[in-house]
Swiss-Prot record:
Organism: Actinidia chinensis var. chinensis (Chinese soft-hair kiwi)
Residues involved in E64 binding: 151
EC number: 3.4.22.14
Role according to the record: Cysteine protease responsible for the cleavage of kiwellin into kissper and KiTH.
Gene behind the chain: ACT1A
Regulation of catalytic or functional activity: Repressed by the active-site-directed cysteine protease inhibitor E64 (L-trans-epoxysuccinyl-leucylamide-(4-guanido)-butane) produced by Aspergillus japonicus.
Pfam family, one: Inhibitor_I29
Upper taxonomic lineage: Eukaryota, Viridiplantae, Streptophyta, Embryophyta, Tracheophyta
Similarity comment text for this entry: Belongs to the peptidase C1 family.
Signal peptide range: 1-24
Active site: 151, 288, 308
Catalytic reactions on record: Specificity close to that of papain
Disulfide topology: 148-191, 182-224, 282-332
The protein's name: Actinidain
One annotated GO molecular function: cysteine-type endopeptidase activity
Length: 380
């Protein structure tokens, strides 16, 4: 016997009322924040991030931007159904244009012909369900690019640091500044804009790269120090691109090493991301270079672990988890142009994550990595 229509209508009205009240309750901070309260938050934020302005007019202009940022954050976080949170960070007083021009320094279009089939999906291939190169000691601590659009250099260096650790067993923090000062090309111009693969090519042509300790970061363009450029502590042999728009191939690559990627980071949600699994909104007009250092699944949601170069004050101590396995270009275009450096060992192939952390989960055949049933299986 069905329920009376009057009962169904009353139930719908009841739950609709509860939903409205819940949203109103969660968003109460939007209406309860007084101007004095927001001003106090702003002044605390200024102290935390060491911000100061030359005039009262500039202070007030930045305060208005801060208020809009805070409103966006409150509105976003009031929705308890969201998979991620946003929060106040060092970008809270910047306009969109200032943020883009200062922190987003990646440009696409270089060396698209060097696509390798090494990590093409193969029928029956099984991948680990979880990879985190941080736990294998192959990831240097979070760095900060500062007010320099050198994200391309940070991404390139992070993957070189990673493959060097995987092949040699030694983790060395390498010099982004050397790439910015000495690695300029027609398309790669230091703090202004750059290609990740131009960073790899510089290291190959130069015969190696110096350490961060010897050639420290300054967050600005400088003259190339030739003496320091000639000190070469880490080398790579070549670089390759993962098949484009193929998240399974990208996942396969990440089981063997951290991978450089680019994505669309221009939106407010990405800019102010603080925790959780980021699902957008974002497009696929890639403008920022980062590094994938792992992947996993939480609550049935697959994600990539992304290392950024915006200090530990952004995201999850400098990292982001971003939605994985959406197909095509991936979330925010993350699968559009993945690339990685190659450093040969006696097997001409890096050790897999599983072989370094757990008993080996892969064996090698003439066709590439072959897995055992401990994770995700690919089928055509």
């Amino acid at each position: 016997m069905g329920l009376p229509k009057s009962f169904v209508s009353m139930s719908l009205l009841f739950f609709s009322t509860l939903l409205i009240l819940s949203l109103a309750f969660n968003a109460k901070n939007l209406t309860q924040r007084t101007n004095d309260e927001v001003k106090a938050m702003y002044e605390s934020w200024l102290i935390k991030y060491g911000k100061s302005y030359n005039s009262l007019g500039e202070w007030e202009r930045r305060f208005e931007i801060f208020k809009e940022t805070l409103r966006f954050i409150d509105e976003h976080n009031a929705d308890t159904n969201r998979s991620y949170k946003v929060g106040l960070n060092q970008f809270a007083d910047l306009t969109d244009e200032e943020f883009r021009s200062t922190y987003l320094g990646f440009t696409s279009g270089s060396n698209k012909t060097k696509v390798s089939n090494q990590y093409e999906p193969r029928v029956g291939q099984v991948l680990p369900s979880y990879v985190d190169w941080r736990s294998a000691g192959a990831v240097v601590d979070i760095k900060s690019q500062g007010e320099c659009g050198g994200c391309w250099a940070f991404s390139a260096i992070a993957t070189v640091e990673g493959i060097n650790k995987i092949v040699t067993g030694v983790l060395i923090s390498l010099s982004e500044q050397e790439l910015i000062d000495c690695g300029r090309t027609q398309n790669t111009r230091g703090c202004n804009v750059g290609y990740i693969t131009d960073g790899f090519q510089f290291i190959i042509n130069n015969g190696g790269i110096n350490t961060e300790e010897n050639y420290p970061y300054t967050a600005q363009d400088g003259e190339c120090n030739v003496d320091l450029q000639n000190e070469k502590y880490v080398t790579i042999d070549t670089y390759e691109n993962v098949p484009y728009n193929n998240e399974w191939a990208l996942q396969t690559a990440v089981t063997y090493q951290p991978v450089s990627v680019a994505l669309d980071a221009a939106g407010d949600a990405f800019k102010h991301y603080s925790s959780g699994i980021f699902i957008g909104p974002c497009g696929t007009a890639i403008d920022h270079a980062v590094t994938i250092v792992g992947y996993g699944t939480e609550g049935g949601i697959d994600y990539w672990i992304v290392k950024n170069s915006w200090d530990t004050t952004w995201g999850e101590e400098g990292y982001m988890r971003i939605l994985r396995n959406v197909g095509g270009a991936g979330t925010c275009g993350i699968a559009t142009m993945p690339s990685y450096p190659v450093k040969y060992n006696n097997q001409n192939h890096p050790k897999s994550y599983s072989s370094l952390i757990n008993p080996p989960a892969f064996s090698m055949s003439n066709d590439g990595p072959v897995g055992v049933d401990d994770g995700q299986r690919y089928s055509a």
